[in-house]
Structure formats: C-alpha cells, structure tokens
Amino acid sequence: LVSRYRTAEYSFPIYRAPKELPKTGQWLTRQQIQDDNVLSGRGLEIAWASDPVDVFFLQIQGSGRLRFTDGDTLRIGYGGSNGHKYRSVGKEMVRRGIYNEHQVSATVIKNWVRRNPQDGLDLLNHNPSFVFFREIDVSDHKGPLGAMNRSLTPLRSVAIDPKFVP
C-alpha cells in the first residue's frame, strides 16, 4: 500500500525525475538524494510508501502497480536514473559477513533490512543507483511495461537492458 500524501506511516517517497537530471552521465548517488533531501518539497513525489525496502525493490524492478490506501491503483514505469551502476546489496551482505553467499535472496535482504532499520538503510545506500518513475496510462489487466514500452506477457517476455540490447 502507498499513500498520496506523506504521513507518519507513509514517509518514503517514490519520485518522478527532476528536470535537471542529465540524459547521460551521472547525477547524485542514492545516499546523496535521500540524505540531503534534494528532491523534497518539489512536487516530484508520485506516492509515499511505508517501507524503504519496497521502494528499493520497486526501483530494481523498474515498473510496478501502486495500490493506494483508498483502493485506487496507479501504474508506474521507468522514468530515468541517476546514471550510477547497480551494486548488489546481497554481495555487500556477504562481504560484511552478515550472511554466506548461498543464504542471500531478495526475501533475506528484505527481512534483514526491516529488522535492522539503521544498518539496513546504510546497506541499501551501498547501491548508488537510483531509479525515477513516470505514471503510465495502461489498463489494469495488462502486465507491467518492458523496455520497449509494451506490456510484458507471462512466460513469454524476457528481461533486457536497452543499453546492451538494441
């Protein structure tokens, strides 16, 4: 669940891209964006989540369907990034001695960050990449959008990165 407004419970923003985001090259890191509140109060918030882990994994996925507290839904898709390469927080957990490599999964990462909020946010900041979103006007029965701006088809679509696949 997400909220249209920031509240004590829903305090983690899902952002659209700012105008000054460069088309190529790097911008601020995840930690700089979040710790310095550079986007705060600029009207770039699409929604507010209650859990930073959900926002982090939404950024990894690149698109999703938001369900608001009032029951409405909104489709969002990739709207740009800060240009930094993704760095695995799972590998960082192994490097820090938190888990062995064979123990790490998305579920393990999510649970550990939720159990360790301060250290968890530090861990998420290990990944400097930050993804921005845009609202998508697509019917609810369609799947999430892929790199070609088409709805994905279960058991048929494959993940690609347009930087590497034309």
Indicate residue ranges for each PLM-predicted region.
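Secretory/export targeting leaders with adjacent low-complexity proregions
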Residues: 1-138, 143-146, 150
